[in-house]
């Protein structure tokens, strides 16, 4: 076992697993008598190792080898030259440091030695200068495997196509816009910004755009990625000193699709690179599609210049599908799996799973798997049994009068206002919301709901549902109110 191997065991005990794997494990240390050369991957990595972990490395090597030693920090990838920083350690090494810079080429060796000086800076501070360049999370993503190969973006999944996307009032505008940009990229809706909660189909739509655009134009250069991968690509290009290639690849795309763009907020280096990438693509008429869990203005920490550019094109929402759409999703999913699902079972699952499409499909898979394993048909009874620990099946179903009370309390009006003939906006809008909630949360027919709201016609209920669905796509305040009420009533 080498001296450095012994040191690694001791260092590992003093660091988190993440720090050890990210910063210490990748470096290579070569020993030649009393000279220890710490090989780092580039200038940034060398500076970070030396400033953040220099004291720990020095004291650990002293413990395993003795005080009489020299530590040399080397940047192997410095173009045309090898830059080293040498620390000579003696009995006072913890308090004094002698630093020299050695620049080597074929003709001469030059060494300049500075006088020893007391350092007032602590190497144990939490944030190095790298964070000023990239932001903490970006810096911590950098690894130092010099021979590691990397590529840009992520593959598109063939299963995500428009034909498998179930359309309803909550997503039809987003779906129509997605189809348009896949046929005529860069012509309309640039950028296309799709926002909505997790598991509602944003990624499906985004990848469907890429897959369909590739069918329309097989020669189109399509890059799909998410913000996490974009950050990794960016910091890897810095680590490998290959930023030109990163920029060449991303800025030469005909269609750029980035999922969960909200995660670049607060990542200064990545946000700046994305800003320039956006500008380059937009000015060249290339299509940009972005998704987020929030409306652009609501993404905390997102630079104003990016918020402004996201507004250049079309912003559309994908909301939780209504009951009918949820049933349609379940029936289609079962059909795609080659399974028969009774309509009443689909309705039962749809009524009780209202969080997102992903959990809806997960519940379906559980019901189908359980029924198949037990050699039973997927009846409501089977669904009740196997989903008991997944969904809270209320002993009493949601009633319209409860919906009316919750909505009235929320908007500080009276229940009788909701059933009255008043048409003022402060009454009419809550009434429409209450009708829409009743349609989604109960099994009552349109005439029954209309009757509960002062004997109104079923067409009035239909109009209310359509109006609120449309408003939820364009008005974040209405959308937020609706989701909050949905949560209150469903508890």
Swiss-Prot record:
Q: What quaternary structure, including any partners, is listed in this protein's UniProt entry? A: Oligomerizes as a right-handed, spiral filament on DNA at oriC.
**Domain remark in the UniProt entry:** Domain I is involved in oligomerization and binding regulators, domain II is flexibile and of varying length in different bacteria, domain III forms the AAA+ region, while domain IV binds dsDNA.
Q: One GO CC term of this entry?
A: cytoplasm
Q: What does this protein do?
A: Plays an essential role in the initiation and regulation of chromosomal replication. ATP-DnaA binds to the origin of replication (oriC) to initiate formation of the DNA replication initiation complex once per cell cycle. Binds the DnaA box (a 9 base pair repeat at the origin) and separates the double-stranded (ds)DNA. Forms a right-handed helical filament on oriC DNA; dsDNA binds to the exterior of the filament while single-stranded (ss)DNA is stabiized in the filament's interior.
UniProt name for this protein: Chromosomal replication initiator protein DnaA
Which InterPro entries has this protein been placed in? Answer: AAA+_ATPase, Chromosome_initiator_DnaA, Chromosome_initiator_DnaA-like, Chromosome_initiator_DnaA_CS, DnaA_C, DnaA_dom, DnaA_N_dom, DnaA_N_sf
Q: Name one GO biological process term.
A: regulation of DNA replication
Q: State the superkingdom.
A: Bacteria
Question: Could you tell me which residues belong to the region Domain III, AAA+ region?
Answer: 155-371
The record's similarity note reads: Belongs to the DnaA family.
- Tell me which residues bind ATP: 199, 201-203
Q: Which HAMAP family match?
A: DnaA_bact (MF_00377)
Q: Where is this region: Domain II?
A: 69-154
Q: State any single GO MF term.
A: DNA replication origin binding
Q: Where is this region: Domain I, interacts with DnaA modulators?
A: 1-69
User: Region (Domain IV, binds dsDNA) spans which residues?
Assistant: 372-491
Q: Which UniProt keywords apply?
A: ATP-binding, Cytoplasm, DNA replication, DNA-binding, Lipid-binding, Nucleotide-binding
Q: Which organism is it from?
A: Francisella tularensis subsp. holarctica (strain OSU18)
The record's subcellular location field reads:
Cytoplasm
């Amino acid at each position: 076992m080498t001296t450095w191997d012994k040191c690694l065991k001791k260092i590992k005990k003093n660091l988190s697993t993440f720090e050890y794997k990210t910063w210490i494990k990748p470096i290579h240390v070569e020993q030649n008598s009393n000279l220890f050369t710490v090989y780092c991957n580039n200038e940034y990595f060398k500076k970070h190792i030396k400033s953040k972990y220099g004291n720990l490395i020095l004291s650990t090597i002293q413990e395993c080898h003795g005080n009489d030693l020299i530590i040399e920090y080397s940047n192997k990838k410095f173009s045309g030259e090898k830059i080293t920083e040498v620390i000579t350690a003696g009995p006072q090494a913890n308090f004094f440091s002698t630093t020299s810079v050695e620049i080597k080429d074929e003709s001469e060796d030059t060494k300049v030695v500075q006088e020893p000086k007391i350092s007032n800076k602590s190497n144990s501070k939490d944030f190095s200068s790298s964070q000023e360049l990239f932001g903490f999370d970006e810096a911590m993503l950098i690894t130092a495997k010099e021979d590691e190969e990397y590529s840009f973006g992520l593959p598109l999944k063939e299963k995500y196509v428009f034909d498998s996307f179930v359309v309803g009032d909550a997503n039809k505008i987003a779906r129509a816009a997605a189809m348009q940009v896949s046929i005529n990229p860069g012509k309309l809706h640039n950028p296309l910004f799709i926002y909505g909660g997790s598991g509602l189909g944003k990624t499906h739509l985004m990848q469907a755009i890429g897959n369909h655009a590739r069918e329309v134009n097989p020669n189109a250069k399509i890059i799909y990625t998410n913000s996490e991968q974009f950050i990794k690509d960016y910091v890897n290009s810095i680590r490998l000193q290959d930023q030109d290639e990163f920029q060449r690849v991303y800025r030469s795309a005909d269609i750029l699709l980035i999922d969960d763009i909200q995660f670049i907020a607060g990542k200064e280096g990545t946000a700046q690179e994305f800003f320039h990438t956006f500008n380059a693509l937009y000015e060249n008429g290339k299509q940009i599609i972005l998704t987020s869990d929030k409306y652009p203005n609501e993404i905390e920490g997102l630079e104003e210049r990016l918020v402004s550019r996201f507004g250049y094109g079309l912003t559309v929402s994908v909301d939780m599908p209504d009951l009918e759409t949820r049933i349609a999703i379940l029936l289609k999913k079962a059909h795609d799996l080659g399974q028969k699902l009774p309509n009443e079972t689909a309705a039962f699952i749809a009524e009780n799973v209202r969080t997102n499409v992903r959990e809806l499909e997960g519940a379906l898979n559980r019901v189908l798997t359980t029924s198949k394993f037990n050699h039973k048909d997927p009846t409501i009874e089977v669904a009740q049994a196997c989903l008991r620990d997944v969904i809270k099946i209320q002993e009493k179903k949601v009633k319209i009068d409860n919906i009316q009370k919750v909505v009235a309390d929320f908007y500080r009006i009276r229940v009788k206002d909701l059933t009255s003939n008043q048409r003022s906006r402060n009454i009419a809008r809550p009434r429409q919301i209450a009708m829409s909630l009743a349609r989604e949360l109960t099994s009552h027919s349109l005439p029954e709901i209309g009757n509960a709201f002062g004997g109104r016609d079923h067409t009035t209920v239909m109009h209310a549902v359509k109006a609120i669905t449309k408003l939820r796509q364009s008005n974040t305040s209405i959308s937020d109110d609706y989701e909050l009420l949905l949560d209150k009533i469903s508890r």
